[in-house]
């Protein structure tokens, strides 16, 4: 792991974060999306997309088609291990199936609180309201969650690909075809272009769930 990945935020930032930490805690029972059949007035289903391997337990989330190589990990860590990944789907013939939220099943116990994942560079100088939160941009309309080792392995893999062809990009020359292939293999709750993928970086045991 390089120096940038292990650098902790400044003490001033950490103090501000501690003072507003409870405001940023989610008050919604997110686990209900994976245990109930109806949320609000909408029927929901649960889609299993395999598991994710966290070899270090230092994890990140981002739009994988835009920021996979540059995203900083969360300050919060979890025990290293391999965990199931589930998607809460809102099926709709009228609007198309929508993915409401994602769950990495770290424990079979019911969560007692939800803490917002933070990377340590968020702007905490402005007043934070009860419903405010920090997150990542979804310029390409997708998300992922993975271990920081997966990011490192992907960067090395992609550097080798770029040596062969410097004009390629991750979406058009990798994920586009993989998403379409996965949609053909697992068409439930997917459009033909593909709405989720669980891809392992070649020659590693690190995988990347995309949704």
Task: Give residue ranges: language-model regions.
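Intrinsically disordered, low-complexity acidic regions enriched in Pro/Ser/Thr
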Residues: 2-211
